[in-house]
């Protein structure tokens, strides 16, 4: 964690360990990406589980991976995003009148420029809540997703509303509620530590209770842990 902001893969919780391992393979560059027609990473699951935050962080983590500054013998889940960020990511908040034409034109514009700015030699595109585009607009994105030098990071709360052609072009990463409340304890402890609250002041059992109440929402979990930290004299990090 960088203050209260996730800055590595291990700052997120995954309901499917196989899916997290896929991301680890990509970030460690053991699994080529894009490869075999898979040009996107689609994060799907319920609200508040960190999908948008992770979608915007993944390009940063890939830049660290391709820069060669991280010792790949160390767990890649701990690999941090570069500080300060130099990554130029084009972010599209789907819905609200955003058209597929606008997205396609932007992708083509980036794809035609030379040289590519990033260490990965790819351009990065985030499509947040892609299911909010109508099905025709989604289908028209299949072609730009096939352009060279492009990586796409998509999120959705409703996987069944995403065009099958887009789904087929993506690695699917499930982000739903983790069934074991104990899995949330390290995250809560990290937040409290960043607030200056001593170890054990808020017990593991209390953190598990907060996790159960949050029902999978990292937004609610983080909020309630912060409130506990403030109640015990902690301060928000600068």
What are these regions (language model features)?
Residues 1-46, 108-117:
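Pre-Walker A (pre-P-loop) alpha-helix and adjacent loop at the N terminus of AAA/AAA+ ATPase modules
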Residues 47-49, 95-100, 131-133, 147, ...:
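Conserved nucleotide-binding/hydrolysis micro-motifs of P-loop NTPases
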Residues 108-116, 126-168:
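Conserved catalytic/switch belt of AAA+ P-loop NTPases
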Residues 225-238:
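Conserved C-terminal helix/linker of AAA+ ATPases
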Residues 163-196, 205:
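Conserved AAA+ ATPase core "coupling" helix
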Residues 204, 212-226:
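The conserved phosphate-sensing helix
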Residues 32-91:
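Walker A/P-loop
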Residues 20, 82-122:
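Short glycine-rich substrate-engagement loop in P-loop NTPases that contacts/grips substrate
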């Amino acid at each position: 964690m960088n203050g209260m902001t996730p800055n590595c893969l291990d700052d997120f919780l995954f309901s499917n360990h196989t899916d997290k391992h896929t991301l680890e393979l990509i970030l460690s560059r053991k699994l080529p990406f894009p490869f075999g027609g898979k040009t996107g990473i689609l994060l799907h699951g319920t609200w508040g589980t960190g999908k948008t935050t992770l979608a915007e962080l993944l390009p940063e983590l890939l830049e660290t991976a391709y820069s060669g500054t991280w010792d790949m013998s160390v767990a890649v889940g701990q690999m941090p995003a570069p500080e300060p960020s130099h990554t130029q990511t084009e972010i599209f908040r789907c819905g609200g009148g955003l058209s597929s034409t606008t997205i396609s034109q932007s992708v083509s514009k980036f794809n035609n420029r030379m040289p590519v700015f990033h260490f990965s030699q790819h351009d990065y595109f985030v499509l947040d809540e892609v299911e909010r585009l109508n099905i025709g607009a989604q289908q028209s994105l299949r072609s730009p997703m096939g352009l060279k030098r492009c990586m796409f990071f998509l999120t959705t709360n409703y996987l069944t509303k995403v065009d099958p052609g887009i789904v087929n072009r993506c690695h699917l990463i499930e982000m739903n509620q983790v069934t074991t409340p104990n899995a949330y304890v390290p995250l809560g402890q990290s937040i409290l530590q960043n607030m200056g609250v001593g170890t054990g002041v808020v017990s593991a059992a209390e953190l598990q209770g907060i996790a159960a109440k949050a029902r999978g929402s990292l937004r609610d979990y983080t909020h309630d842990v912060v409130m506990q930290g403030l109640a015990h004299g902690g301060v928000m990090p600068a």
